[in-house]
């Protein structure tokens, strides 16, 4: 059962054990089970989502087993995962991060830039980490000049001057 990364716990919210999750792109509104994974840990068990609501730029998520602020703070830094089959389809112009990793990145002229090897959450515009064929890295913001073609299995960039230098 494939697990998809929905985001990361960045802080505790309130006093009742809500986790402040960044990067979920709204998937937490519908998913009923998530897993929290700290770096270096094996696959964690799924936990029931008791409540999920938007909280500014974050999602405030309450799960079984986390009932106060102290226990929520213990999860700061953990990845939030869900089973692929528990998630709705991403829809047009939407995507899950796991759908992007491994995709080739090309310019609108068809020139190869590299392969998506990671993503950064910046709080505003997420940034693709693109590893070039030479082994270098390019950071490409998911801005209007980037088209994610999940069906075509590629990312197309119309880079502004200087982006790829």
UniProtKB/Swiss-Prot annotation:
What's a single GO MF annotation on this record? ribosome binding
Which domain of life does the protein's organism represent?
Bacteria
Listed name of the protein: Ribosome maturation factor RimM
Function description? An accessory protein needed during the final step in the assembly of 30S ribosomal subunit, possibly for assembly of the head region. Essential for efficient processing of 16S rRNA. May be needed both before and after RbfA during the maturation of 16S rRNA. It has affinity for free ribosomal 30S subunits but not for 70S ribosomes.
Can you state the subunit structure given in the record? Binds ribosomal protein uS19.
Question: Record's domain comment?
Answer: The PRC barrel domain binds ribosomal protein uS19.
Q: Tell me which species this is from.
A: Anaeromyxobacter sp. (strain Fw109-5)
Broad class of the protein's primary localization: cytoplasm
List localization entries: Cytoplasm
Query: Where's the PRC barrel domain?
Result: 92-163
């Amino acid at each position: 059962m494939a697990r998809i990364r929905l985001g990361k716990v960045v802080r505790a919210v309130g006093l009742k054990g809500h986790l402040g999750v960044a990067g979920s792109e709204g998937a937490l509104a519908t998913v009923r089970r998530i897993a929290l994974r700290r770096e270096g840990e094996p696959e964690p068990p799924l936990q029931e989502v008791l409540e999920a609501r938007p909280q500014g730029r974050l999602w405030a998520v309450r799960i079984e087993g986390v009932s106060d602020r102290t226990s929520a703070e213990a999860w700061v830094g953990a990845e939030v995962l869900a089973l692929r089959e528990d998630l709705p389809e991403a829809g047009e112009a939407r995507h899950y991060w796991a759908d992007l990793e491994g995709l080739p990145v090309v310019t609108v002229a068809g020139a190869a830039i590299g392969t998506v090897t990671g993503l950064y959450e910046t709080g505003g515009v997420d940034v693709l980490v693109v590893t070039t064929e030479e082994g270098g890295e390019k950071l490409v913001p998911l801005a209007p000049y980037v088209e994610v073609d999940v069906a075509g299995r590629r990312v197309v960039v119309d880079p502004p001057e200087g982006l790829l230098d």
